[in-house]
């Protein structure tokens, strides 16, 4: 623990306290700093106690909601305008009630609009830290000239307000470089890197029921796993194409060894690909993308099957299994029992799923770009003392060779890769490490 003269009063300001990756980071940071003895509260414009993390719903963290009565959009448009309006309302409440004077630090993330107001009205010793997950202006699709014109003032506001904070931190060295490339007027600022985390203090959230459900369902048949939201940006087709290519390589190799092929046919222990993740039938892209992935399987002669709910039965001929909207316990059981996690997003600025896999002693294959280069240590055959998986370009032919190579590795090497991954997460990506990094910066 870092040394402090006294515990501080710290307020987080976050737009919508749901269950996304940004919210997970805010909750972990808040709990970690609270465990260090600081007085913590989270201010937000929206928090549904039936759709939030347990630390929030249980009351472990204090949460104060202001501005939820204001709309989030107008006919599906103007999202950024209303996000700013809701945050403005929240900060006005802090100002007019005098509450803004109560804190030693404000930690703001996602939306930087309020920072100049906080600086103007907070007490003279108060400091504001901004946590930049990724520049908001790079997350927006500018599909028309009007949309580009509409974003101009908001992009300028983002750059100005971000630069007005006392401290800026980012979630990876990759995001740090993007920060410099995007905010040209802030080239005098050098953000510090504070990595997101996973909770390493508690046992991975599985139970005997979900573990048994997975093992009985697959009957000791090996499977590879891809976990992502069903969104096109997640590049899940890379996993499918790689798996299809690997299947062809395996068949070619098996034909040369008839006995091995016969064994696979008799025991039905052929490897499968499981694609699981966030899915909402109300979201058009989720529905469309799942259909597109199923069509891709058909084109590649991969028999695919979709299960919504409990794992009970699937045809033995299935190659690819889709599992939309699975529980946390089932997700973690799949991670623990898979041969290899296939992490396919091409421009991920960090990525929590690889950490979850490594914590569960599961090796990871990820694209060698962005955040995963900072979390996954590539196994090159000579670094078994530290490797945790594989990083490779997003070429499905190269991925297929790595998948097959890993599948045929001796068990001791697989175990060592898994142990390395868990140790790396505990040492570099724990909640205590996150809180300690923030605590050091604030002090």
Curated annotation (Swiss-Prot):
Pfam families: Glyco_transf_4, Glycos_transf_1. GO terms for cellular component: endomembrane system; endoplasmic reticulum membrane. Glycans are attached at residues 173, 207, 304. One of its GO terms (molecular function) is GDP-Man:Man2GlcNAc2-PP-dolichol alpha-1,6-mannosyltransferase activity. It catalyses: a beta-D-Man-(1->4)-beta-D-GlcNAc-(1->4)-alpha-D-GlcNAc-diphospho-di-trans,poly-cis-dolichol + GDP-alpha-D-mannose = an alpha-D-Man-(1->3)-beta-D-Man-(1->4)-beta-D-GlcNAc-(1->4)-alpha-D-GlcNAc-diphospho-di-trans,poly-cis-dolichol + GDP + H(+); an alpha-D-Man-(1->3)-beta-D-Man-(1->4)-beta-D-GlcNAc-(1->4)-alpha-D-GlcNAc-diphospho-di-trans,poly-cis-dolichol + GDP-alpha-D-mannose = an alpha-D-Man-(1->3)-[alpha-D-Man-(1->6)]-beta-D-Man-(1->4)-beta-D-GlcNAc-(1->4)-alpha-D-GlcNAc-diphospho-di-trans,poly-cis-dolichol + GDP + H(+). The keyword Ubl conjugation does not apply. The keyword Cell wall biogenesis/degradation does not apply. Pathway: Protein modification; protein glycosylation. It is found in: Endoplasmic reticulum membrane. InterPro entries: ALG2, Glyco_trans_1, Glyco_trans_4-like_N. It comes from the Eukaryota. It is a single-pass membrane protein. The chain crosses the membrane at residues 80-100. One of its GO terms (biological process) is dolichol-linked oligosaccharide biosynthetic process. Keywords: Endoplasmic reticulum, Glycoprotein, Glycosyltransferase, Membrane, Transferase, Transmembrane, Transmembrane helix. Mannosylates Man(2)GlcNAc(2)-dolichol diphosphate and Man(1)GlcNAc(2)-dolichol diphosphate to form Man(3)GlcNAc(2)-dolichol diphosphate. Belongs to the glycosyltransferase group 1 family. PANTHER family: ALPHA-1,3/1,6-MANNOSYLTRANSFERASE ALG2, ALPHA-1,3_1,6-MANNOSYLTRANSFERASE ALG2. This is Alpha-1,3/1,6-mannosyltransferase ALG2. It comes from Candida albicans (strain SC5314 / ATCC MYA-2876) (Yeast). The gene is ALG2.
